[in-house]
Amino acid sequence: MAFSSISFLFYFLPLFFIIYYLIPARAKNVVLLAGSLFFYAWGEPRWILLLLASILVTWLLGRAMRPEASAGRRRGLLILGLVFQLGLLVAVKYAGFFFGAFIDLPKLHLPLGVSFYTFHAISYLVDVYRQKTPPQKNLLRLGLYLALFPKLVMGPIVPYHELEPALAQRTIDAQDVSDGCFRFTIGLAKKALLADALAGLVTGIWGDLASLTVLSAWLGLIGYALQLYFDFSGYSDMAIGLGRMLGFRFPENFRYPYLCSSISDFWRRWHISLGSWFKEYLYFPLGGSRTGTLRTLRNLLLVWLATGLWHGASWNYVLWGLYFGVLICLEKLLAPRFRAHPRKGLLAGLYRPVCLLLAVLGWVLFRAEDLPAAGRYFACLFGGAAVASAQARLYLHDFWPVLLLGAVGATPLCAKLAGRLGAKLQPGVRAALQAVLVLALLACSTVWLLNGSFQSFVYFQF
């Protein structure tokens, strides 16, 4: 059940919130966990047992890692938990990639959210082992942490200690509901009115690589970069908004990544919660940047190899991860020179656009079906095809408005203008205008969805 589906927007969500707000506080966790499991089972009924098994094993191992247990026992339990969670992930996501050349394996449909709830479980077990957080004795609360429906399928990935207080007790006021509803609607509009509108351009171009021209290749790449941003950041906005309406505060997951000042800065702005997870639970345990230059570069490459594999079991994702790993390593090596000789003049003016170009070019590996298709696409981008065709010019004619709107929407311009306007208005007027905007965006998004323009979220496949 996708957040942007009619069944979620007009059936599940209203009914769930009516029940949730009417019941007493002591029953909210029970209803929320039941609603979360129903939400998951609606789309993945055969994989609900896998989620429940992950919850139960994580809870049992966390309980067994009590502080008074010996260090060796706790370490052994942590290893057991990591083997279980990573083994689960390998079995359903990577078995064909790692072992398909040796044995004939059935092709499994990837369970929704498995990459996300597995990482949540690992972070909990590691934090309990480090005694950063006490073991959760209440199975219901731990189950809710792993299965909480706003973040279950596509994140954000939130460390357990950040949600622990709200799992035990939370309050919800009118401001939470208002702000959460507004944030959810902004995310819905990003998804329905921008990401799904760009899907026609992206699908048309990427689905017919034989007809690629230089113009269509660039249109397809720019369109995909914007589609992916609005698709995933829109989901994150909806998740953050839903969490707020339920009494939870989720961290931001995007911060205008296409305004990056470097490749490293791009990844401090894109899928922030995933980058934070890899930094805390892989990069730092490997030694981070405290182990000398060569080991630091090794650590960075290992993290980016893991990041690529996390996204998917194919050589495209492996190379995509290594592509960004190499770029970040180069930045690490060249940083002392840049500090000694600050960028000035033409170099300073070119650095940002070059970094943006390199970041966007990485999406070719991310989107292409396989490596030969990626190679073909790269060749067409840089002159390995006719400059344009009638079809390419038609794409430009039909989609330039949404491309322009997307380019503006990928900057903080609209948010800044709205903030300045809101600061000049009385609170009552501001609230009324916000309500009108919510209703207008909801109506426009609903019309678009009812016209049959619904597209699945891109990150559902991860």
Task: Give the label of every model feature segment.
Residues 1-461:
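Membrane-embedded transmembrane alpha-helical bundles that form the catalytic cores
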